[in-house]
């Protein structure tokens, strides 16, 4: 039987009237169910997003709190390290020395000609220069830290160089006595030592003579001088520890100004030590007058040179029988040397620091600098080319004769007059530059 169009349409109409409401109801239920599922999913997503945002905010809050606490701890630790941390040499207030006026002395430049210099060798520092029998001797060292430092006593005549003696540590000074014996001051991490070098057919042996005073180890011994009567004078820069070498000890005393530097005399015949002078803010150099009756001592922190009788006992810098021979120096004096004609040569390690002396009466900033470490301290002091690296003065009347200048900046650690020349220990330790006088 064939179904026509009309019959087909009637069947569809009857089916739609019979089944349609149920289909519509099913679709409506399905749509509502889907909408409810979507709503629940949306709520869950919103809840998840809100929870994630809350967790993120809580985490950020905890992070900010932790960062604040950490920052406060760092600031407190920094404040403790720079301001409150105990140090071995707490700074002391002092009165800044006066500034000397221009002396009008002849200005002399150190020679740039290599022919005027004495070749030394590959070393990192020079602490002392002496001349004897036409030869020049220099104490030079290698080693960035004192624990690794080795020092040689180098002899040169301008053409040939030889290390005649070697010691562990820093050989800060040496001097020949009237009998030709060699006296040395050596600094090691354990402390300072006054030594004597004896030579025989087997070689040269170094004997420790003085290692402590009144049961306490010697500090950083900085210089040695021998008198015509056989007495050996030696200086201790300060009471600070010697673990970083002489230069750092002097720099520490310069900032702390503890006034614990001393000069001692060792009597070889009596095998006894007496204190000559105390209260020095960095005893950095010694020299004897040609007649051996007057001892000159450079005071680093006070920018002066003291003059005391060579046979003095228990004097105090600036006190009775201690004369301020030179004051208001333009730099911080180091090594001294006196020639037979009565001229005293003063070398300068650093130029006067206006920052340091501006804070002389206060200990806060100097204490911070002392706690800040060696790298920062090294940047506080320098010897620029416009400042004299050394000067010469007549011992008889204290008149200034020469001011020496170098074309390269750098501290001068040693000075030695030899006939018509003066040799210097400078930052260029490959050679010893000179100046004609």
Residue ranges and their predicted role:
Residues 22-34:
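Membrane-spanning helices that line or support transport/gating and their immediate boundary helices
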Residues 1-25:
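Hydrophobic single transmembrane helices highlighted by the model
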Residues 51, 74-75:
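Terminal non-domain segments
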Residues 4-8, 64-74:
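Hydrophobic H-region at the start of alpha-helical membrane spans
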Residues 54-66:
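Short, Lys/Arg-rich cytosolic juxtamembrane segment immediately N-terminal
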């Amino acid at each position: 039987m064939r179904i026509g169009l009309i019959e087909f349409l009637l069947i569809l109409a009857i089916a739609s009237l019979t089944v349609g409401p149920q289909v519509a109801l099913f679709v409506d239920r399905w749509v509502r169910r889907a909408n409810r599922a979507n709503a629940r999913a949306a709520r869950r997503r919103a809840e998840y997003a809100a929870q994630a945002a809350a967790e993120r905010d809580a985490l950020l809050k905890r992070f900010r709190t932790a960062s604040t606490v950490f920052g406060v701890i760092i600031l407190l630790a920094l404040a403790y390290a720079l301001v409150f941390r105990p140090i071995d040499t707490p700074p002391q207030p002092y009165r800044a020395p006066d500034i000397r006026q221009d002396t009008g002395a002849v200005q002399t430049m150190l020679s740039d000609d290599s022919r005027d210099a004495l070749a030394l060798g590959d070393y990192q520092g020079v602490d002392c220069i002496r001349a004897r029998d036409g030869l020049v001797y220099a104490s030079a060292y290698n080693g960035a830290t004192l624990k690794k430092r080795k020092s040689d006593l180098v002899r040169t005549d301008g053409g040939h160089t030889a290390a005649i003696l070697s010691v562990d540590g820093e050989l800060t000074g040496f001097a020949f006595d009237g009998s030709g014996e060699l006296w040395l001051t050596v600094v090691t991490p354990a402390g300072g030592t006054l030594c004597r070098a004896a030579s025989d057919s087997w070689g040269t042996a170094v004997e420790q003579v003085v290692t402590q005073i009144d049961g306490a180890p010697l500090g950083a011994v900085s210089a040695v001088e021998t008198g015509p009567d056989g007495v050996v004078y030696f200086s201790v820069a300060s009471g600070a520890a010697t673990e970083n070498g002489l230069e750092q000890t002097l720099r520490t005393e310069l900032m702390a100004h503890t006034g614990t530097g001393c000069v001692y005399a060792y009597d070889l015949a009596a095998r006894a030590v007496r204190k000559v002078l105390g209260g020095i803010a960095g005893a950095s150099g010694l020299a004897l007058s040609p007649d051996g009756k007057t001892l000159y001592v450079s005071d680093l922190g006070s920018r002066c040179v003291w003059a005391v009788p060579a046979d003095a006992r228990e004097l105090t810098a600036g006190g009775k029988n201690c004369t301020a021979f030179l004051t208001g120096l333009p730099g911080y004096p180091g090594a001294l040397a006196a020639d037979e004609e009565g001229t005293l040569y003063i070398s300068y390690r650093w130029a006067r620091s206006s920052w340091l002396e501006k804070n002389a009466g206060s200990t806060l900033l100097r204490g911070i600098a002392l706690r800040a470490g060696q790298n920062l301290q090294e940047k506080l002091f320098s010897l620029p080319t416009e400042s004299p690296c050394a000067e010469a003065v007549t011992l008889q009347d204290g008149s200034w004769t020469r001011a020496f200048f170098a074309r390269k900046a750098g501290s001068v650690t040693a000075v030695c007059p030899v006939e018509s020349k003066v040799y210097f220990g400078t930052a260029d330790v490959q050679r010893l530059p000179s100046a004609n006088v």
